[in-house]
Amino acid sequence: MAVESGVISTLIPQDPPEQELILVKVEDNFSWDEKFKQNGSTQSCQELFRQQFRKFCYQETPGPREALSRLQELCYQWLMPELHTKEQILELLVLEQFLSILPEELQIWVQQHNPESGEEAVTLLEDLEREFDDPGQQVPASPQGPAVPWKDLTCLRASQESTDIHLQPLKTQLKSWKPCLSPKSDCENSETATKEGISEEKSQGLPQEPSFRGISEHESNLVWKQGSATGEKLRSPSQGGSFSQVIFTNKSLGKRDLYDEAERCLILTTDSIMCQKVPPEERPYRCDVCGHSFKQHSSLTQHQRIHTGEKPYKCNQCGKAFSLRSYLIIHQRIHSGEKAYECSECGKAFNQSSALIRHRKIHTGEKACKCNECGKAFSQSSYLIIHQRIHTGEKPYECNECGKTFSQSSKLIRHQRIHTGERPYECNECGKAFRQSSELITHQRIHSGEKPYECSECGKAFSLSSNLIRHQRIHSGEEPYQCNECGKTFKRSSALVQHQRIHSGDEAYICNECGKAFRHRSVLMRHQRVHTIK
C-alpha cells in the first residue's frame, strides 16, 4: 500500500495479548498538493505545510535519505527562510508550541485570528479575557448550535479525566495552563511502556502487557520497516541507519480503523519523544479537507469555514459578512467609532489589538523583515512581500476593464474608480468628492487653513509637502530639471516644459478669437486683452 502524507504516527493497542504487533504503513488518498492549489491564501498554505511537516510519516521511499529530503523540503516550505529571519523562525516555532498547549476552543479561536507572533496571540487572549469578565458572557458557537457558556468549556487536558469538568475563570486558567505535551512525564511513560509493553490506564481500555520484538528500551528508539512479511524484525538505532516515525497495529485492523485510531500517540522527534495521548472518542469530529479532528461538532463547523469560505455573521450596518462572531464584533467598531486599544507611548487608539501591536513597532523601531536584494527592512512581513515585487516585477492585480496590472491591491482599487467614476471621499464643508482619501485630506486644508509643512530655513509654511520641496530649492539652489537639448537647468518641471517648447516650436496656447498661438499661457492672457478692449 502506498503512503500519503497527513497520517499521524501512532501506537495502537491490541486486544488479544498473545497476538504480536507488526509494523505497517497507512494509505490515505488525501493530496496535499491539490489542497495547496485550491487554497489561495498564503497563510493558509503555510499552515498546510506546517501540518504536513508535523504529520509526515515514513512512505515507500528508497530509503531514509529520501525521507529526510522530503522533511527538509516541507520544513523549508513552512518556515520560508528566504523571507524570514532567524528571529522570525524562532518566533514561529514558539508560537506553534504556545498554541498547542491552549485549550481546544481557545486554540481554534486564536488560530482563526492568524496571529503572526506569540506576543500577538497573548494580546488576543488578554482581549478575550476582558470581553468575558462578565460571568454571563458566552463564547460564540456555530450558527447551528447554541452559544457555549464560557465556564462550561472543557480544557484539553481536563477532558482526559472527565468531560464534565468546567473551566476555571479565564484569568485563573491563564495562570494555570500546563503543556499538553510534557517531555519529562510523557517520555517516562513512553520508556515504561517500552520496557513493560504498553501499560496504560484501565479506563482507556488498553492491554496490560502486549509484547514488542526487537525494540530498544530507550524512549528515542524509532524503527524503519524491514520487508513486508508478517512477524518481521524491527531494527533498533544500535543497528545503524536513520529512523522515522512508525505505526504499530494489530494486523486484524483495517485501513479505515487504523486511520480512525491515528491520534493515539504522536511521535514528534527521534531524540525526544513527546506522546500526546488523544483517544479518538474524545475527538470524533474530523475535517475531511485537512484531517484536523475536534471534540465538539461546533468546533469542526467553525474550522471548516476556513476551507468553505462561509461567512454567516453579517453586519446590519453595511452588510459585510464574517466567518466568526468575534470578527463581526471587531468590524462593528468601525461604525461605532470605538477604539479600545490605546498606545501608551503616544496615546493613539485603535479598534483592533493587532493594529496596536503593529503601531508599537514605530516607537521601538523594530524592523525584523529584511529584503535579501537591497537590504531594506520592514516592520511587517506583508510590507516585505509587497516591496519584493519591485525586484521581481510581479504585478498580480489586473484591471478587468483595461488590463492594466498593479503590484498592490489598493492601487488596483484606486485605479478602478477611473472606470466607475466613484468618488467615495466627500468634503463636509463644500461637498466636493474625491477618488482618494489623501486628496480629500489635502483639499480640507483649504477650508481649515492648515499648513503643516514648514521651511526650516525661513519658517514659511505650506499645505502640501511638494510645495515645500519646491520652495526649499530657493535656499539650496538646486535645479534638478535639465533640458536635453541645451543643458539648461530649472527648479521646477513646469519651467522645463515651457522651455522645451522653444526647441520644439510647440505653441500650446491658442487664442479663441483670432487663432494666434503662444508658448506661454501668460502671454496668451496678455494678448486676449487686445480683444476685450475692442
UniProtKB/Swiss-Prot annotation:
Record PTM Phosphoserine, positions in chain: 31
Please list the residue ranges annotated as the SCAN box domain. 50-132
Q: For this chain's UniProt record, which GO biological process terms are given?
A: negative regulation of DNA-templated transcription; regulation of transcription by RNA polymerase II
Q: What are the boundaries of the C2H2-type zinc fingers?
A: 285-307, 313-335, 341-363, 369-391, 397-419, 425-447, 453-475, 481-503, 509-531
- Which cysteines are cross-linked by disulfides? none
Q: Where is the composition biased (Basic and acidic residues)?
A: 193-203
Q: Which Gene3D superfamilies match?
A: Classic Zinc Finger, DNA breaking-rejoining enzymes
List the expressing tissues: Expressed strongly in testis, moderately in skeletal muscle, pancreas and prostate, and weakly in heart, placenta, liver, kidney, spleen, thymus and small intestine.
Report the GO terms under cellular component: cytoplasm; cytosol; microtubule cytoskeleton; nucleolus; nucleus; plasma membrane
Q: Does the keyword Repeat apply?
A: yes
Cross-link type Glycyl lysine isopeptide (Lys-Gly) (interchain with G-Cter in SUMO2), placed at: 55, 171, 202, 251
User: Which SMART domains would you find in this protein's record?
Assistant: SCAN (SM00431), ZnF_C2H2 (SM00355)
Keyword Cell membrane on entry: no
Q: Where is this region: Disordered?
A: 180-217
Q: Which GO terms describe its molecular function?
A: DNA-binding transcription factor activity, RNA polymerase II-specific; protein heterodimerization activity; protein homodimerization activity; RNA polymerase II cis-regulatory region sequence-specific DNA binding; zinc ion binding
Q: Which UniProt keywords apply?
A: Cytoplasm, DNA-binding, Isopeptide bond, Metal-binding, Nucleus, Phosphoprotein, Repeat, Repressor, Transcription, Transcription regulation, Ubl conjugation, Zinc, Zinc-finger
Q: How does it assemble?
A: Isoforms 1 and 3 can both homo- and hetero-associate. Homo-association of isoform 1 is dependent on the presence of the SCAN domain.
Relate the protein's function as given in its record.
Answer: Isoform 3 acts as a DNA-dependent transcriptional repressor.
- Family as reported in the entry's similarity comment: Belongs to the krueppel C2H2-type zinc-finger protein family.
Protein name (record): Zinc finger protein 397
Q: Which organism is it from?
A: Homo sapiens (Human)
